[in-house]
Amino acid sequence: MSKHVIITGTSRGIGFELVKQFSEKGYQVLALSRNAKPILDLKLLNVTAFPFDLSKKADFHKVETFVKNEWGHVDILINNAGALLNKPFSETTLEDFEFVYKTNVFGVAEMTRVILPFMKTQSHVLTISSMGGVQGSMKFPGLAAYSSSKGAVITLTELWAEEYKETGICFNVLALGAVQTEMLEEAFPGFEVPMTPKSMANYIFDFSTTGQKYYNGKLLQVSNSTP
């Protein structure tokens, strides 16, 4: 039986690299991003991609319909999409918080809720968080909306693991340190770190395919630098 993985935030960075890795390993991949063109341009036979916005309710129905009609089950969900805002708290409006939380928290929760009925024992929901969302970690000015949203999905993961513990579905969260992605460069111009999207994608691929054998409801910190 084919293995099925859904990845959000696939137009660039870590998500883009993950799609290529899962495709190379023979998985059936559903790649979701507001801009589907970068993935479609790869012309990978085992990858389906269409425009998807975590803040739009109708887009979730499109995903649910696809999974129900084409796959029937999902082995791995990687909640990778994220919105990063670097802005002084005094200038961060309610609308700014809503924008970040719609993608980083509400979208993650809804995607997981929609996909769970298609998962089974040893299926894995892996959410990508940030070191900034970890209690006691170094914090950075300007990241009030972003880091607090990343803390929220850490707690969500722990709650899911408890609520669904009888199903055998596993939920884990990775708190990443800084990775040299376009999103990081946009938020922190000139900031450079040694970790590349491809290197981090290597780790996430391995953990998403094997981590559920050893962990459930766990936060793992994956960082040699911050934020």
Pin down the residues of each PLM region:
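Conserved glycine-rich Rossmann-like NAD(P)H-binding loop of the short-chain dehydrogenase/reductase
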Residues: 25-40
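Substrate-binding pocket helix/loop in short-chain dehydrogenase/reductase
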Residues: 88-89, 96-98
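N-terminal Rossmann NAD(P)H-binding glycine-rich loop of SDR-like oxidoreductase domains
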Residues: 11, 19
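Catalytic loop of short-chain dehydrogenase/reductase
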Residues: 126-152, 157-158, 162-165
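C-terminal helical subdomain
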Residues: 166, 173, 189-227
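Conserved NAD(P)H cofactor-binding loop of Rossmann-fold oxidoreductase domains
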Residues: 80-85
